Amino acid sequence: MNISLVDLTWACLMVSFTVSLALVVWARNGF
C-alpha cells in the first residue's frame, strides 16, 4: 500500500474540514 504525501495531506484536510463543519452545526444547534 503506497500512500503519497499529497494524498495524506488531502485526507487530513478533508477530515479537518468535516470536523470543523460538524462543530459549527453542533454549536448552531445550541450544543
Swiss-Prot record:
Disulfide bonds: none annotated. Its main location: plastid. Keywords: Chloroplast, Electron transport, Membrane, Photosynthesis, Plastid, Thylakoid, Transmembrane, Transmembrane helix, Transport. One of its GO terms (biological process) is cytochrome complex assembly. GO terms for cellular component: chloroplast thylakoid membrane; cytochrome b6f complex. GO terms for molecular function: electron transporter, transferring electrons within cytochrome b6/f complex of photosystem II activity. It comes from the Eukaryota. It holds the Pfam family PetN. Belongs to the PetN family. Component of the cytochrome b6-f complex, which mediates electron transfer between photosystem II (PSII) and photosystem I (PSI), cyclic electron flow around PSI, and state transitions. The 4 large subunits of the cytochrome b6-f complex are cytochrome b6, subunit IV (17 kDa polypeptide, PetD), cytochrome f and the Rieske protein, while the 4 small subunits are PetG, PetL, PetM and PetN. The complex functions as a dimer. This is Cytochrome b6-f complex subunit 8. It comes from Cyanidium caldarium (Red alga). The lineage of its organism: Eukaryota, Rhodophyta, Bangiophyceae, Cyanidiales, Cyanidiaceae. The gene is petN.
